[in-house]
C-alpha cells in the first residue's frame, strides 16, 4: 500500500473495543517509530509516555477534554509531552546534535522570546504526532489524536 492509499484509509476512531489490546511487540515497534520521528534540526524536544494501566488511564481521562470514554476504552494511551524547560532543552541539543544544528538554533531560535521558543518546541511534538498516526494506520491500529491533558 502506498502512502496516499494509507492516508485515504486512515480515520479517527470514535469508539474503541475494550477487549482488543495492542500487543507488546506492537508497542515496542511504535516506540521505535517515535524515536525516529522527524523534528526541526532533529531537536526531538519531547517525551512519550505509554499508559496501559487502567487506573492511570482513568486518572488521565478525568482531566481530559471530552475524551474520558475513549481513553478508558482504548488499549493504551500515549501521552506526547513537550520539554518545557528551555535550559534543559538547550543542554540536550548541545550534547546530542551536530554543530550545524546547534548553530541554527543559536542564530534563529535562541534570540526569540521564551514564549516563541516554547511554541516552536510544541510544534515539533505535533510533527511526531502526525508521524505516529501514520504509523498506527500502517499497522492497522486504531487511533484518536486528542489534546487537553496538561
Residue ranges of each PLM-predicted region?
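Acidic, surface-exposed loops and disordered segments
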Residues: 1-150
